[in-house]
């Protein structure tokens, strides 16, 4: 039971972190692209 609970809790945290990291990456990429276009 412990082994089943751990994997179930990990994906939720990974999904949330991945979503936040993805948003941050998109924001950084957007700023970089905007700077390149402006230059």
From Swiss-Prot:
Note the InterPro entries from the entry: PSII_PsbL, PSII_PsbL_sf
Q: Carries keyword Thylakoid? A: yes
Task: Set out the biological process GO terms recorded for this chain's protein.
Answer: photosynthesis
Topology relative to the lipid bilayer, per the entry, is: Single-pass membrane protein
Q: One GO term of the cellular component aspect? A: photosystem II reaction center
- Principal location class: membrane
Which SUPFAM superfamilies does this one have?
Photosystem II reaction center protein L, PsbL
Compartments it resides in: Cellular thylakoid membrane
- Keyword set, alphabetical order: Membrane, Photosynthesis, Photosystem II, Reaction center, Thylakoid, Transmembrane, Transmembrane helix
Membrane spanning stretches: 18-38
Repeat among keywords? no
> Which cysteine residues pair off into disulfide bonds?
none
Pfam families recorded:
PsbL (PF02419)
Q: Which family does it belong to?
A: Belongs to the PsbL family.
**Task of the protein:** One of the components of the core complex of photosystem II (PSII). PSII is a light-driven water:plastoquinone oxidoreductase that uses light energy to abstract electrons from H(2)O, generating O(2) and a proton gradient subsequently used for ATP formation. It consists of a core antenna complex that captures photons, and an electron transfer chain that converts photonic excitation into a charge separation. This subunit is found at the monomer-monomer interface and is required for correct PSII assembly and/or dimerization.
Q: How does it assemble?
A: PSII is composed of 1 copy each of membrane proteins PsbA, PsbB, PsbC, PsbD, PsbE, PsbF, PsbH, PsbI, PsbJ, PsbK, PsbL, PsbM, PsbT, PsbX, PsbY, PsbZ, Psb30/Ycf12, peripheral proteins PsbO, CyanoQ (PsbQ), PsbU, PsbV and a large number of cofactors. It forms dimeric complexes.
Spell out the NCBIfam families in the cross-references.
PRK00753.1
Provide the protein name.
Photosystem II reaction center protein L
Name of the encoding gene: psbL
């Amino acid at each position: 039971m412990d082994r089943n609970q751990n994997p179930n809790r990990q994906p939720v945290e990974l999904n949330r972190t991945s979503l936040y990291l993805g948003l941050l990456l998109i924001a950084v990429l957007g700023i970089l692209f905007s700077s390149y276009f402006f230059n």
